[in-house]
Amino acid sequence: MPATPSQFIWYGLCSSNPAKAAEFYGAVLGWTVQGSGPTEMNYKAWLAGGEGIGGLLEITPDMALGGMEDGWLGYVDVEDVDASVATIVAKGGHSHMAQTVPGVGRMAMVSDPQGAAFYVMKPEPTDAGPSPAFAPRVLGHGGWNELHTKDSNAASVFYRELLGWTSDASYGMSAMGAYLTFNVGGDAISAIFNSPGFPKPRWLYYFNVDDIDAAKARVEAAGGTINAGPMPVPTGQWMLNATDPQGAMFGLLGDKA
């Protein structure tokens, strides 16, 4: 998997019904799924325009008993997974599991001090070039990464210190406070803000579409639910967030026709 330091390099969906998930995201985003991964788990890759941008993992009964729910998890490229995990734990976060997959890389599922889960990963090979997973305005790829949390100031400090993200801009959001955006290497990649309407802190990942209204209609026709939007954003685009038929939240980002 190609590397892009401190960037989101993969988007993984844990699903209680992978076949239904593949059908839904295929209808909404045009994705296809490919094969099974290098492990014994039922794992497939999401392809957008023929490029791998994420994975689809089946939630087994044992995983469900352990508390795993349908949802998306982003993978962030780090130089040293174990050192990053130690830093996360020292700062009040948690480590849930770590593994090394030959030919893919070392990774660990973690959560920040407020409970938002994500992965840190050191991909292999290390000279494969930039990951295509996050590619603003490229259809079907990740277009934005948004942390809904309870203390945006504390979360901002945590991610800046862990990943070296730098502040990009701040937008007022009335009662929710500031919408803080961050960049890596000069490229805007994420935002952090207080979101009291969410049941618990989580990352929400937005994928690019050509027409936000047409995409909204596809979500609804395929059995998904629109939670908010479409709403305009400073880039001139529009975004919405939604829930797939199995309960996983995601976002879409695009223009209006």
Give each language-model segment a name.
Residues 1-4, 7-16, 44-46, 62-87, 89-143, 147, ...:
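Vicinal oxygen chelate
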Residues 2-52, 90, 98-105, 109, ...:
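Core segments of cupin and vicinal oxygen chelate
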Residues 34-36, 59, 195:
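Short beta-strand micro-motifs enriched in acidic
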Residues 38, 48-50, 56-68:
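Conserved donor-binding loop and adjoining core beta-sheet/short helix segment
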Residues 52, 70, 117, 188, ...:
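Glycine-rich acetyl-CoA-binding "A-motif" of GNAT/NAT acetyltransferases
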Residues 54-57, 190-194:
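Short amphipathic beta-strand/extended segments with alternating polar/hydrophobic composition
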Residues 55-61, 65, 74, 78, ...:
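DNA polymerase sliding clamps and clamp-related checkpoint/processivity subunits
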